[in-house]
């Protein structure tokens, strides 16, 4: 619903769009854009089986706008419950991608709508402090950890995702250590975890210049997989390793083909449509 974001991540593929986005305008039109789209899909005989809110950062929108979006999405799932169920789709609540910066003040709203949460962090956590800062360049890692503790107690669907660049894989033992830390010390079930790899972006380079991070090499990705397999096979996180951690690289999620249009498309608040969120 908006490209605006309250962070300035080193690897953000949206570049300066996150600071130039017209948040006030997005807030005014997001609800109507979604309403128009769901109505148009229904009129065309197309069943929207997964309505997720992405960004930018969704939680930069005012709470009343979020409330209206969540209400509409829940009503959509309820209206089409039987059709979704017959096709094997189990969604019944809104889903958002969030950096957790405003998770605590919005907790009650999320809880009321049973919102499914996908929270983005950096691993190792030391790089979260360096590469996932506020727009003013401030480290907010302690607040992140507090919000992960809160997320661990959140009673609805949730997961954590981490975007990895070459710099993130320079110290794989630290990354492994922090997975255990989140799981054992902060109490978040790290079976519910996704790995993603940063990719090159001209918008990112234009915004960050020489500070841009480097995509992982195939050798680094293989080294990561080998280390995770050696560490977590035979532990309480084996299921996550086998089922979820690399889920976004499986054909059921992503075809890894340009403009495939097979599963998802991106709808902007101004009504513009793209074939993929990436």
Which residue ranges define each predicted feature?
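Conserved alpha-helical substructure of the radical SAM core
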Residues: 1-96, 101-105, 113
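Active-site cores of enzymes that catalyze phosphoryl transfer or operate on phosphate-rich substrates
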Residues: 4-5, 120, 144
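Radical SAM enzyme [4Fe-4S]-AdoMet core and its adjacent flexible, acidic
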Residues: 126-145, 149-261, 266-270
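Short, surface-exposed basic-aromatic patches at helix termini and helix-loop junctions that form
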Residues: 71, 108-116, 136, 177-184
């Amino acid at each position: 619903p908006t490209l605006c974001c309250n962070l300035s991540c080193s690897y953000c593929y949206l570049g300066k769009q996150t600071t130039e986005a017209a948040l006030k305008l997005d807030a005014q039109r997001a609800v109507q854009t979604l309403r128009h789209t769901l109505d148009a899909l229904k009129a065309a005989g197309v069943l929207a089986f997964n309505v997720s809110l992405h960004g930018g950062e969704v939680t930069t929108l005012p709470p009343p706008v979020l409330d209206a979006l969540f209400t509409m999405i829940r009503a959509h799932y309820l209206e089409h419950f039987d059709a979704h169920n017959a096709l094997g789709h189990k969604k019944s609540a809104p889903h958002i991608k969030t950096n957790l910066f405003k998770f605590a003040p919005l907790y009650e709203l999320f809880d009321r709508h049973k919102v499914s949460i996908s929270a983005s962090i950096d691993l190792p956590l030391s790089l979260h402090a360096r590469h996932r800062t506020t727009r003013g360049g401030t480290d907010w890692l302690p607040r992140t950890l507090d919000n992960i503790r809160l997320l661990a107690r959140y009673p609805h669907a949730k997961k954590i995702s981490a975007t990895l660049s070459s710099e993130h894989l320079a110290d794989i033992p630290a990354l492994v250590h922090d997975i255990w830390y989140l799981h054992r010390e902060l109490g978040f079930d790290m079976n519910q975890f996704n790995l993603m790899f940063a990719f090159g972006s001209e918008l990112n380079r234009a915004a960050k210049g020489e500070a841009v991070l480097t995509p992982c090499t195939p050798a680094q990705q293989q080294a990561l997989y080998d280390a995770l397999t050696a560490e977590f096979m035979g532990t309480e996180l084996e299921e996550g390793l086998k089922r979820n951690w690399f889920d976004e690289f499986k054909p059921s999620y992503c075809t890894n083909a340009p403009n495939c249009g097979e599963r998802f498309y991106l709808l902007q608040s101004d009504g513009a449509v793209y074939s993929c969120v990436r």
